[in-house]
Amino acid sequence: MRLLGLTVVLSVSVWGGAAAQTVPAPAPTARLSGAIAILEKHNKPSPDIGDAVIYLVSGAGTAARPVTMDVTIADKKFVPDVVVVPVGSTVRFPNTDPFSHNVFSASDPNGFDLGLYGRGEAKGHLFEHPGLVYIYCNVHSGMIAYVQVMPTRWFTQPGADGSFTIMGVPPGHYSLHVWHPRVAQEVVQDVDVPVAGLGLAQPVQLDARGFKWQPHKNKYGKPYPTNAGRELY
């Protein structure tokens, strides 16, 4: 009944000569496409090029709608080991191993400690701040994942061939950021996206030739014990 009454009032207003409101046309958007390439030692192919994250930064940008995503723990690994989520999203860490894990991060201001939990359990964390978050297990020193928390809605990851596309980009000036877990610093370049869209003429090049695995500390800020990861079933 309330819906019917509202309909009648609106009808009277329109027929009474009230000015009709014009719905503005949606702002035009464009597509940015390109590719990345990673320089490797001895010119070897990059097996993990799909772990890269590409995103656009603009002063007028807004974050996408928050999501909930699972990063599964299986065989002492985080799967997937790189995820990209908008600010305000929750990432859950279901444990499918037959032993316990303790997922944590010391990446402020997104640091957290989920404590020890066993097979069949899942715990998660709400990521309220943008930035790169390193994820570890306090039991197994070899476990690592990366959560990129995005303040922008324009982000993607490349395919196995390094190609990428970002859709729905309003025409304008942006900083294009490319990150990869084995590259020390993001590659950043300016791009101007016209109404017709933009295809980058050259691949964005990253250099992983100097990468070396660096051991990290446990959640107490101390080195892992030599027997870390030895399972007690």
Segments from the language model and where they lie:
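Bacterial N-terminal signal peptides
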Residues: 5-15
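Extracytoplasmic copper-binding redox domains, predominantly the cupredoxin/blue-copper superfamily
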Residues: 21-233
